[in-house]
């Protein structure tokens, strides 16, 4: 029985040994190694030769310090395996070892173990990315360190490799020469000088740690294009400075142009106020005082005595106060009127010869008197007022109207007539040339009232009136008018009387002296006005004429003077209508 048990054990042993011999028939993997980056640990092995489609590989991991192997995965047909999850503590441990075998059904191969220990020094150093930019002709780069997702929060590249980090930078120009420029920096920020070259530049970075033997891997190539920078900071500053200067110059020119063309203030003498349409409509023009021109009644004027018509009154503009101012009309031609009735003048001369009277002023050559002098009554008896012409030493320079009102104190008839407009004296009975045209003459002017102290005792009041002849050659005539009432005219106050022709007629030139008290309607040459019309109290002309009854006697000579002394002009002229 003992021999049966020995045979059974030998058979079992032979079966077991046969099974072991059959499992060793597959070849083992040629090599096993780790390829690790920062927190990316991969185990690689080499496949067995002549493997079938059913061949797979088993992996076991051994950590230093622990004696047993730890099977990591089931059989897989891949040639690599990611051990990152089971080796997270790699950077804080002594390292790991791994082994791999091939399995094909019931057969398997021997284990192939890594040749080296997998530690931190086996980790290949890399960078996450490289960022490039251009600034003032420099390429500025920034290295981004790797940030793996599976890494613990406290395990970063900076914390693990805290010292002696270095980066090697390679620059390549595309296109053109492909020479690389290598540069090492110790910081993640770097700058590269391009030397003014333009084109595309590509940069690569490889990290390293000076205190370790870790390998570094070149990063992915980053490229940037360089062109000529026209809008640099310097160029922009220069451009804006130029624009600012140009704007300032334009503003100055514009301001100067506006200053030159601005509306300037005119002098006050050149300012004209625009009339407002409302003011122009509302305001009415004020009436202006104008010279009154009266028409001449030629038929009535022919009835006036030739002595009164031919008197020289045109050149007189005297004020009557003895001023030496020359007349403004002395150079004007004299208007002389012929005497249409020479016989009447002789008859008048026989009855009452006119008296040649002296001027009221001492020197008639320089006199600018109006020529009308109203003498005070003399103590000697008088036959009546006479018309008397002023005769001076030099009648050519006289600016007198030629009318003088004096009183003949001696009562004698003058045997001499006034001189002509040319200044010569004529006999009492002149022969007026027949060829003279009997033109009708109208004049208006002022008559002066004065007292002649030199002739108070020698003359009675004579009113002498001169009328310029048309040709300037006729003699001057004087006529004395005797007041039929026999009253001596009182002394007259100094002043002016306006002579204004009205529609009144005078008696014919041949009438006797007593017939001068004609109705006022017959006077056309001399206008009669009442004494009450004289409105100026200083002259007191109406008061002095009250005894004469100038209002009661319309034919009186003194009533023929108009009293409009304010509004009418001083200088009068003779108007002749032919």
Curated annotation (Swiss-Prot):
Disulfide bonds join 56-75, 202-223. It is linked to Inflammatory bowel disease 28, autosomal recessive: A chronic, relapsing inflammation of the gastrointestinal tract with a complex etiology. It is subdivided into Crohn disease and ulcerative colitis phenotypes. Crohn disease may affect any part of the gastrointestinal tract from the mouth to the anus, but most frequently it involves the terminal ileum and colon. Bowel inflammation is transmural and discontinuous; it may contain granulomas or be associated with intestinal or perianal fistulas. Residues 357-371 have a biased composition (Low complexity). Keywords: Cell membrane, Cytoplasm, Disease variant, Disulfide bond, Glycoprotein, Membrane, Phosphoprotein, Receptor, Signal, Transmembrane, Transmembrane helix, Ubl conjugation. Belongs to the type II cytokine receptor family. Glycans are attached at residues 50, 74, 110, 154, 177, 189. The keyword Transmembrane applies. One of its GO terms (biological process) is ubiquitin-dependent endocytosis. GO terms for cellular component: apical plasma membrane; cilium; cytosol; nucleoplasm; plasma membrane. Residues 257-578 are cytoplasmic. Residues 22-235 are extracellular. InterPro entries: FN3_dom, FN3_sf, Ig-like_fold, Type-II_Cytokine-TF_Rcpt. The lineage of its organism: Eukaryota, Metazoa, Chordata, Craniata, Vertebrata. Gene3D superfamilies: Immunoglobulins. This is Interleukin-10 receptor subunit alpha. A motif (BTRC recognition motif) lies at residues 318-323. Residues 313-436 are annotated as: Disordered. The chain crosses the membrane at residues 236-256. Residues 1-21 form the signal peptide. Interacts with IL10. Interacts with IL10RB. Interacts (via its cytoplasmic domain) with JAK1 (via N-terminus). Interacts with BTRC; this interaction leads to IL10RA ubiquitination and subsequent degradation. Interacts with STAT3. (Microbial infection) Interacts with human cytomegalovirus protein IL10. GO terms for molecular function: interleukin-10 binding; interleukin-10 receptor activity; signaling receptor activity. Its main location: membrane. Cell surface receptor for the cytokine IL10 that participates in IL10-mediated anti-inflammatory functions, limiting excessive tissue disruption caused by inflammation. Upon binding to IL10, induces a conformational change in IL10RB, allowing IL10RB to bind IL10 as well. In turn, the heterotetrameric assembly complex, composed of two subunits of IL10RA and IL10RB, activates the kinases JAK1 and TYK2 that are constitutively associated with IL10RA and IL10RB respectively. It is a single-pass type I membrane protein. Phosphorylated. Phosphorylation of the cytoplasmic tail induced STAT3 activation. Ubiquitinated by BTRC; ubiquitination leads to endocytosis and subsequent degradation of IL10RA. It is found in: Cell membrane; Cytoplasm. Primarily expressed in hematopoetic cells including B-cells, T-cells, NK cells, monocytes and macrophages. Not expressed in non-hematopoetic cells such as fibroblasts or endothelial cells.
């Amino acid at each position: 029985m003992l021999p049966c048990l020995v045979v059974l054990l030998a058979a079992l042993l032979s079966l077991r040994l046969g099974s072991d011999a059959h499992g060793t028939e597959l070849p083992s993997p040629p090599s096993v190694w780790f390829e690790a980056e920062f927190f990316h640990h991969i185990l690689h092995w080499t496949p067995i030769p002549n493997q079938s489609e059913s061949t797979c590989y088993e992996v076991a991991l051994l950590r230093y310090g622990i004696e047993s192997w730890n099977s990591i995965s089931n059989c897989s047909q891949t040639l690599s395996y990611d051990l990152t999850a089971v080796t997270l503590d790699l950077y804080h441990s002594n390292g790991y070892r791994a082994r791999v075998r091939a399995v094909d059904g019931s057969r398997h191969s021997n284990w192939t173990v890594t040749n080296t220990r997998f530690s931190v020094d086996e980790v290949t150093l890399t960078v996450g990315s490289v960022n490039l930019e251009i600034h003032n002709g420099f390429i500025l780069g920034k290295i981004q360190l790797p940030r793996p997702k599976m890494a613990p929060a406290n395990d970063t590249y900076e914390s693990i490799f805290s010292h002696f980090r270095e980066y090697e930078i390679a620059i390549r120009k595309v296109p053109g020469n492909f020479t690389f420029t290598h540069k090492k920096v110790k910081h993640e920020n770097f700058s590269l000088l391009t030397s003014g070259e333009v084109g595309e530049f590509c940069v690569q970075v490889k990290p390293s740690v000076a205190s370790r033997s870790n390998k570094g891997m070149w990063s992915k190539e980053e490229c940037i294009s360089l062109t000529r920078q026209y809008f640099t900071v310097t160029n922009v500053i220069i451009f804006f400075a130029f624009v600012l200067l140009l704007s300032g110059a334009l503003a100055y020119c514009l301001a100067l142009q506006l200053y030159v063309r601005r509306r300037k203030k005119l002098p006050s003498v050149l300012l004209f106020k625009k009339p407002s349409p409302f003011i122009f409509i509302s305001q009415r023009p004020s009436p202006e005082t104008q010279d009154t021109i009266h028409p001449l009644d030629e038929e009535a004027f022919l009835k006036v005595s030739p002595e009164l018509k031919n008197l020289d009154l045109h050149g007189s503009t005297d004020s009557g106060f003895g001023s030496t101012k020359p007349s403004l009309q002395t150079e004007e031609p004299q208007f002389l009127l012929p005497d249409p009735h020479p016989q009447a003048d002789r008859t008048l001369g026989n009855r009452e010869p006119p008296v040649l009277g002296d001027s009221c002023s001492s020197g008639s050559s320089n006199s600018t008197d109006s020529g009308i002098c109203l003498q005070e009554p003399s103590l000697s008896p008088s036959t009546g007022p006479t018309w008397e012409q002023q005769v001076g030493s030099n009648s050519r320079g006289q600016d007198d109207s030629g009318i003088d009102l004096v009183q003949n104190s001696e009562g004698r008839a003058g045997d001499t007539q006034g001189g002509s407009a040319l200044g010569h004296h004529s006999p009492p009975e002149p022969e007026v040339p027949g060829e003279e045209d009997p033109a009708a003459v109208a004049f208006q002017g002022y008559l002066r009232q004065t007292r002649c102290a030199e002739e108070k005792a020698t003359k009675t009041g004579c009113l002498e009136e001169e009328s310029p002849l048309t040709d300037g050659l006729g003699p001057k005539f004087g006529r004395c008018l005797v007041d039929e009432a026999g009253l001596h005219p009182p002394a007259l106050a100094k002043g002016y009387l306006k002579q204004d022709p009205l529609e009144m007629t005078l008696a014919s030139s041949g009438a006797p002296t007593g017939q001068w008290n004609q109705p006022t309607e017959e006077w056309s040459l001399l206008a009669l006005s009442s004494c009450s019309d004289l409105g100026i109290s200083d002259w007191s002309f109406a008061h002095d004429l009250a005894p004469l009854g100038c209002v009661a006697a319309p034919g009186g000579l003194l009533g023929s003077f108009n009293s409009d002394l304010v509004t009418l002009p001083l200088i009068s002229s003779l108007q002749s209508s032919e």
